[in-house]
């Protein structure tokens, strides 16, 4: 039987992709959280894979980064 990756590592990989994209756009965590109208501590927990990322939240992050959701998910799958 094929093994299935657990959600926790996927959350961490998605968070790492989001962090990388945010940094390449020159945002600090605080500035980006303000940009997308999100509390900085909550946003930081998303990047660290400590919060379960809802699709509506991912949409908000993607909009702020100006990337399609599929780009983040694809990058997280290949990490």
What are these regions (language model features)?
Residues 19, 30, 59:
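Residues within the helices of the helix-turn-helix
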Residues 23, 34, 63:
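Alpha-helical residues within the helix-turn-helix
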Residues 2-3, 8-9, 63, 73-79:
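Short, charged recognition helix plus adjacent turn
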Residues 26-48:
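Short alpha-helical DNA-recognition segment
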Residues 16, 26-27, 53-56:
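Residue-level signal for the short linker/turn that defines the boundary of a DNA-recognition helix
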Residues 56-71:
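DNA major-groove recognition helix of helix-turn-helix/homeodomain DNA-binding modules
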Residues 2-23:
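A short, Lys/Arg-rich alpha-helix, primarily the initiator
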């Amino acid at each position: 039987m094929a093994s299935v990756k657990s959600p926790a590592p996927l959350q961490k990989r998605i968070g790492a992709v989001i962090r990388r994209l945010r940094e390449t756009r020159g945002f600090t965590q605080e500035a980006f959280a303000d940009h997308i109208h999100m509390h900085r501590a909550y946003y930081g927990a998303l990047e660290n894979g400590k919060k379960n990322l809802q699709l509506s939240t991912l949409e908000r992050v993607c909009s702020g980064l100006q990337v399609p959701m599929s780009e983040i998910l694809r990058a997280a799958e290949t990490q």
